[in-house]
Amino acid sequence: MTNSRQPAFNPGELNVYSTPRDVTNVSSALRHTGRRVMLVPTMGALHNGHLALVRAAKRVPGSVVVVSIFVNPLQFGAAEDLDTYPCTFDDDLALLRAEDVEIVFTPTAAAMYPHGLRTTVRPGALAFELEGGPRPNHFDGVLTVVLKLLQIVRPDRVFFGEKDYQQLVLIRQMVADLNVDVVVVGVPTVREVDGLAMSSRNCYLDPVQRDLAAALSAALTAGAHAATGGAQAALDAARAVLDATPGLVVDYVELRDAGLGPMRDNTFGRLLVAARLGATRLLDNISIEIGNFSGIASPDECRVEHAQTPWMK
């Protein structure tokens, strides 16, 4: 026997659901009326970077935007900040209401994993490089929760920021390899005035660390402009900026191709950096072209508004 209860949905208002079945039923009903469902997965503590994803989703004609807020325990390691991750739920809802978001999904861990870790997604080799080096199970947790959200919401499009570029690439791999019927949209990184990539974890930085954190974007810019001299010149220029920053502990500076495979000369690539200031770990990346006059592959890299017409149709 099926459950005939249909959850309430008020068009033009912010509707908050905590039960996966409710979101699935509402999404299905909306699709049957011709609405196009867009998903923006988040862990809350929203900032302008998240809002750029929402705005990109809302630009799709006929869209209804679903924002999920779920701090996923599967993607945190034993010594990481699961218990202290920023929680600003009321403020998050106010921001989303101001953006005219119609659906927010706020499940509990028990609702998302009612049977524990009985079934999970196991990614390929890329998940154990870069961010996966010190965090070997991180992307298992990321891909598992993303796949579950896609199954629950059944969106036409799902939106992720390019700041977590490795995550974006791995999600695209999963969607392709598992034949998931969704378009994955990457939205350019949104930055503070001094270039620091927006992140919910930036609130952990004290004032001195906050000033020093701008070195990551400065390093990427230096690398991009040095790329006319080749891949090694780009890496050396980025590393020089980071090494000159007191208190900054660099985990890696790497140049990869757009799919995060090995980089080759005279091609587009991604310059990625991870570093720590105190207990706070920071990530950033930029698209560059080796041998290009400016070295910067995308002139819209740092812009909040970014047109991606193929997925907007």
Swiss-Prot record:
Pathway terms, separated by semicolons: Cofactor biosynthesis; (R)-pantothenate biosynthesis; (R)-pantothenate from (R)-pantoate and beta-alanine: step 1/1
SUPFAM superfamilies: Nucleotidylyl transferase
InterPro entries (UniProt xref): Pantoate_ligase, Pantoate_ligase_C, Rossmann-like_a/b/a_fold
Subcellular location, principal: cytoplasm
Bilayer-crossing regions: none
Domain of life, per lineage: Bacteria
Chain positions recorded as beta-alanine binding sites: 75
Statement: the UniProt record of this protein carries the keyword GTP-binding: no
Keyword ATP-binding: yes
Residues annotated to bind ATP: 43-50, 161-164, 190, 198-201
GO biological process annotation, one example: pantothenate biosynthetic process
Gene Ontology molecular function terms on file: ATP binding; pantoate-beta-alanine ligase activity
GO cellular component terms, A-Z: cytosol
Gene3D superfamilies: HUPs (3.40.50.620), Pantoate-beta-alanine ligase, C-terminal domain (3.30.1300.10)
EC number annotated for this UniProt entry: 6.3.2.1
Active site: 50
Residues that bind (R)-pantoate: 75, 167
Location(s) in or outside the cell: Cytoplasm
Catalytic activity as recorded in UniProt: (R)-pantoate + beta-alanine + ATP = (R)-pantothenate + AMP + diphosphate + H(+)
Physiological role: Catalyzes the condensation of pantoate with beta-alanine in an ATP-dependent reaction via a pantoyl-adenylate intermediate.
Family according to the record: Belongs to the pantothenate synthetase family.
Subunit structure: Homodimer.
Note in the entry: The reaction proceeds by a bi uni uni bi ping pong mechanism.
NCBIfam families: panC (TIGR00018)
Name used for this protein in its record: Pantothenate synthetase
Lineage: Bacteria, Bacillati, Actinomycetota, Actinomycetes, Mycobacteriales
